[in-house]
């Protein structure tokens, strides 16, 4: 991958989720709705505030990911899933609002979103190619990101 990430277009984001008054929250409302990350990998450092990160497991259930001192959460992104023909799965995740009985809480996280070089070609790696040969067509990382941004903008 070295030649595909030596000019990466990554981003570091400081995420602040302010306290939400329970009376202003609709049933089932989330701080961040279910989504996957677009790039290759995401490294997340989260605080231990209630109402945190949840991931959807292979059992289709949502599982809380507790913050652990000194630990980072590593999420596989859509680009890496495409490079591996799904052998490594992109992580569907969301951020919950704390329950009303947990008191007032803000949430702070730091996320590093790693993306490949804008012109890197995302094409299924040979060892990951399925026996039936069916794979997504090659795409540049830049086009992949733009397609994902536009898809999100359209609400897809």
Where are these regions (language model features)?
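C-terminal flanking tails of non-heme Fe-dependent oxygenases
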Residues: 1-156
């Amino acid at each position: 991958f070295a030649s595909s990430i030596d000019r990466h277009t990554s981003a570091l984001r400081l995420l602040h989720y302010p306290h939400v008054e329970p009376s202003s929250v609709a049933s089932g409302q989330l701080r961040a709705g279910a989504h996957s990350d677009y790039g290759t990998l995401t490294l997340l450092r989260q605080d231990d505030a209630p109402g945190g990160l949840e991931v959807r497991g292979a059992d289709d259930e949502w599982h809380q990911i507790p913050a652990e001192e000194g630990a980072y959460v590593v999420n596989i992104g859509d680009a890496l899933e495409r490079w591996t023909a799904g052998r490594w799965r992109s992580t569907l995740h969301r951020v919950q609002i704390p329950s009303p009985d947990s008191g007032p809480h803000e949430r702070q996280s730091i996320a590093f979103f790693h993306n490949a070089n804008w012109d890197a070609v995302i094409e299924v790696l040979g060892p990951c190619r399925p026996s039936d040969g069916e794979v997504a067509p090659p795409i540049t990382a830049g086009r992949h990101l733009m397609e994902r941004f536009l898809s999100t903008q359209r609400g897809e």
